[in-house]
């Protein structure tokens, strides 16, 4: 059923990081799918020149989505020339100045908005806080997207509302504390990313966070890449506590990707096919594009994988044998494959031989694993990943947690810990329970986006009816 007979225009502006770009592009696909019977929506994506090739390639199946590049600012202190996304930053310590620099896009963004058809609503990343100012100038309702789930948001809100960790000396970084609004959940101070340790940089990070919070509270709502059935108590908490903008679950957005066409199989798929034929389950190992793992820790991971005797496919940008020394590749030749190229993670997780995923628990990766029914071995490293891991392991029980020696998030993980937890996930009773649970959540995930009846589909319906009708009544152009 069509929301309106008028033609509507939606603007998407993702942050310059693949983990943030992809979900918003998938949301653009979902918008068009929602209106495929009677195309009454157009979608425009804003980005910068160095990010446009990736976006255009990702959307090659969806030429209806228009992509506009804005010139990325030059001569930013500490940022190498030509760096336009966080994956290319020499260090994540440059994240705050990089994010601050995006505000220099604002005048170009607003000049371009003047030339476009009337915008029905905008979805922009929370790190692009300044887009709320642009939205207000043009009287455009703005939704904010942070790329996190409702669980992490709700727990964070409760912790900061009750000021659990405001006094530096009040709790050690690793002392468990009960979350007042969720008494079954215990968190540690180190579960919350405090930015950097340098005072000036911490101050800059705090200032950026305050700007984000201010812009978020003036937004029309949150778009959450999740589904209600996965975390209903936390969605309800977020929508019932105070005057914050309403959050809307519209995922899992990874399920909007089109089926792969018959292109040539890469070597890693041939290897997985072989393992399937041999009846050998495979552990997929990947930590995203921004995890900073020391060579010492990488060596320990390699030895832990080797000791576990489990078959594994490990995707890493580093030359493992160069770090560990000659002989490692020969020793794991039958059981392991190391890939240093870009891979299609969804295709790997969907492969019948893959029975576990050792992950940093970035939300995109965790949710993909849930959607295909693969349990997780959670090893969080930064940002809200510790909360994602807590949700995966303790709340919905679809995974096992890797523990550091000192109990902190960024502490060292031994080969014995890794080997033991790998075997527990792949062969143990906890792994069997996680595998059973994740299969059930996988079914729920697919049901959430069923046309007409899914919870996320209905949420999108409500958003479009509310915003598009209200823009019609205010004289929005067709």
UniProtKB/Swiss-Prot annotation:
Transmembrane segments: none annotated. InterPro entries: Tudor, UDP_glucos_trans, UDP_glycos_trans_CS. It is an enzyme of class 2 (transferase). Its EC number is 2.4.1.-. UDP-alpha-D-glucose binds at residues 289, 343-345, 360-368, 382-385. One of its GO terms (molecular function) is UDP-glycosyltransferase activity. Pfam families: UDPGT (PF00201). Keywords: Glycosyltransferase, Transferase. Belongs to the UDP-glycosyltransferase family. This is UDP-glycosyltransferase 90A1. It comes from Arabidopsis thaliana. The gene is UGT90A1.
């Amino acid at each position: 059923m069509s929301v309106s007979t008028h033609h509507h225009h939606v603007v998407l502006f993702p942050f310059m990081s693949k983990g943030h770009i992809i979900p918003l592009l998938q949301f653009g696909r979902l918008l068009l799918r929602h209106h495929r019977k009677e195309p009454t929506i157009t979608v425009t994506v804003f980005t910068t020149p160095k990010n446009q090739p990736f976006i255009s390639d990702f959307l090659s199946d969806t030429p209806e989505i228009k992509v506009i590049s804005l010139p990325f600012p030059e001569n930013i202190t500490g940022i190498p020339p030509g760096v336009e996304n966080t994956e290319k930053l020499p260090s994540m310590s440059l994240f705050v100045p990089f994010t601050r620099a995006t505000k220099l896009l604002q005048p170009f963004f607003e000049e371009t908005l003047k030339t476009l058809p009337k915008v029905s609503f905008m979805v922009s990343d929370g790190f692009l806080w300044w887009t709320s100012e642009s939205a207000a100038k043009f009287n455009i309702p703005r939704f904010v997207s942070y790329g996190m789930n409702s669980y992490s948001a709700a727990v964070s809100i409760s912790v900061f509302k009750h000021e659990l960790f405001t006094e530096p000396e009040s709790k050690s970084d690793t002392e468990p504390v009960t979350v007042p609004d969720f008494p079954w959940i215990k968190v540690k101070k180190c579960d919350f990313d405090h930015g950097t340790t340098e005072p000036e940089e911490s101050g800059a990070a705090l200032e950026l966070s305050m700007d984000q919070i201010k812009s978020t509270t003036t937004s029309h709502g949150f778009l959450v890449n999740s589904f209600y059935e996965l975390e209903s108590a936390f969605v309800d908490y977020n929508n019932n506590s105070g005057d914050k903008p309403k959050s809307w679950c519209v995922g899992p957005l990874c399920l909007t990707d089109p089926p792969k066409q018959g292109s040539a199989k890469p070597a890693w798929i041939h290897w997985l096919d072989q393992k399937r034929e041999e009846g050998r389950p495979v552990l997929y190992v990947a930590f995203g594009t921004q995890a900073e793992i020391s060579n010492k820790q990488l060596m320990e991971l390699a030895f832990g994988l080797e000791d576990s005797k489990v078959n594994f496919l490990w995707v890493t940008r580093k030359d493992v044998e160069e770090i560990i020394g000659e002989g490692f590749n020969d020793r794991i030749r039958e059981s392991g494959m190391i890939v240093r190229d870009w891979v299609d993670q969804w295709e790997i997780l969907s492969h019948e031989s893959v029975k576990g995923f050792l992950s940093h628990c970035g939300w995109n990766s965790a949710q993909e694993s849930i959607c295909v029914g693969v349990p997780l071995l959670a090893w969080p490293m930064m940002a809200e990943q510790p909360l994602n891991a807590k949700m995966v392991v303790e709340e919905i029980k679809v995974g096992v947690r890797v523990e550091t020696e000192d109990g902190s998030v960024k502490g060292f993980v031994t080969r014995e810990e890794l080997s033991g937890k790998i075997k527990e996930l792949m062969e143990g009773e906890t792994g069997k329970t996680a595998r059973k649970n994740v299969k059930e959540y996988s079914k729920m995930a697919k049901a959430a986006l069923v046309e007409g009846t899914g919870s996320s589909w209905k949420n999108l319906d409500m958003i479009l009816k509310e915003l598009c009708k209200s823009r019609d009544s205010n004289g929005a152009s067709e």
